[in-house]
Amino acid sequence: MPMPTHLHAMPARALAMGLALFCSLAQAVTVEFQRVADGVYAFVGETGARTAENEGLNANIGLVVTPAGAVLIDSGATFQGARQIAEAARKVTPQPIRWVINTGGQDHRWLGNGYFQAQGTESIAHAAGEADMKNRGNDHLVGLKAVLGAKADGTVPTLPSRWLKSPDERLELGGVAFEFKHRGGAHTPGDTLVWLPQKNLLFTGDVVYVDRMLGVIPV
């Protein structure tokens, strides 16, 4: 069996080959999905910290296109960032975004939920992260506003509309299977792997880090 493709922290240079780092950081973020498998795409975020230029989108965002609609893996850090993600998805597919899967409790995984829920999109996460999201959502927003300023305007911490409770769950949309695997949390309590068996592809969220180290912050 071939090894699965891992999507978490692919190099930012994949989106900005040939640009000097200081130049790319000075420009506003452009959300653009690149194909990684048949019907599967990813926006590869910067591996550095949140900045006003990257609008807090220093994470990878997945897009899975099915015959019954599209699925986003994570919703971005802000309302405005979520709108950019949606616009980028429309350049890939005319399919409506049916689901947003929040892989964890970091701001850039779920604070864009409000935008998508206003469009009628269902947001899905593991119930192990519910308390963490409730307790830290406003703190995340305060931190984002300090960095992003007006780019955080319109953002309201909006909890997922559907909670998964078992360690292993399987959902299907348009004949495409999504297997959710919660193994006790990682960076946050709700961190969940999303396995696409038909694609042999794994979205790892904040469970696996590549090309960077976890932040070590005194508390």
Locate each region found by the language model.
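Bacterial N-terminal signal peptides that target proteins for export
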Residues: P2-L15
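Acidic/histidine-rich helix-loop elements
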Residues: V44-A59, M133-N135, V142, R212-V219
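Metallo-beta-lactamase
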Residues: G69-V71, S75-F79, R170, A177-V219
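Pre-active-site segment of Zn-dependent metallo-hydrolases
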Residues: A49-A59, V65-W99
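Bacterial N-terminal signal peptides
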Residues: R13-S24
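Zn-dependent metallo-beta-lactamase
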Residues: F22-A68
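Short, solvent-exposed loop/turn elements at domain surfaces
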Residues: F43-V44, A49-N54, V71-I73, G81-A82, ...
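Active-site HxH/HxHxD metal-binding segment of metal-dependent hydrolases
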Residues: E87-R170, P189
